[in-house]
């Protein structure tokens, strides 16, 4: 009985170590995403972090105003944004800033003229 328990524990640990790869996350990468960064680069500031594991629990290491820093993560909906083949002739206009600004399964995606809510790409 004891050997079976150890084998089961070993198998669970082996499978658990592969979960980040299965779900597309790197080891040490936290759930969630980084908020959009629309800020201009005003200063050359050294990065405050290199990876998520250097940040407190609810924060991710994200680019913000031209350098990496620990900021609150945002929820990310499943699926990827469709490619936009258009060119914008008007000024950028953002209709959303993060996925939670969009209804249902729609994601906040970059388009030619800014960000807007779109259905995720199929595939």
From Swiss-Prot:
The compartments listed are:
Secreted
Q: Which residues form each disulfide bond in the chain? A: 34-62, 41-66, 49-61, 55-70, 81-109, 88-113, 96-108, 102-117
Q: Which GO terms describe its biological process?
A: antibacterial humoral response; innate immune response
GO MF entries: serine-type endopeptidase inhibitor activity
Q: Which residues form the signal peptide?
A: 1-24
Q: GO CC terms for this protein? A: extracellular space
Matching SUPFAM superfamilies? Elafin-like
Q: WAP domain spans which residues?
A: 27-73, 74-121
Q: Is Acyltransferase set as a keyword in this record?
A: no
Per UniProt, the keywords (alphabetical) are: Disulfide bond, Protease inhibitor, Repeat, Secreted, Serine protease inhibitor, Signal
Entry-linked Pfam families: WAP
Which residues, by range, are in coiled-coil regions?
none
Q: Which Gene3D superfamilies match?
A: Elafin-like
Q: Which InterPro entries match?
A: Elafin-like_sf, WAP_dom, WAP_four-disulfide_core
Q: What is this protein called?
A: WAP four-disulfide core domain protein 5
Task: Give the encoding gene's name.
Answer: WFDC5
């Amino acid at each position: 009985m004891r050997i079976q328990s150890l084998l089961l524990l070993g198998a669970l640990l082996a499978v658990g170590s592969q979960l980040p790869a299965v779900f597309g996350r790197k080891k040490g990468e936290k759930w969630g995403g980084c908020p959009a960064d629309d800020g201009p680069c005003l200063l050359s500031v050294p990065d405050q972090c290199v990876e998520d594991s250097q940040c407190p629990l609810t924060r991710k290491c994200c680019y913000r105003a031209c350098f990496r820093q620990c900021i609150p993560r945002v929820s990310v909906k499943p699926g990827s944004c469709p490619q936009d083949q258009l060119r914008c002739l008007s000024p950028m206009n953002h209709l959303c800033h993060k996925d939670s600004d969009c209804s249902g399964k729609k994601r906040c995606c970059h388009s030619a003229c800014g960000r807007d809510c779109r259905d995720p790409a199929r595939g």
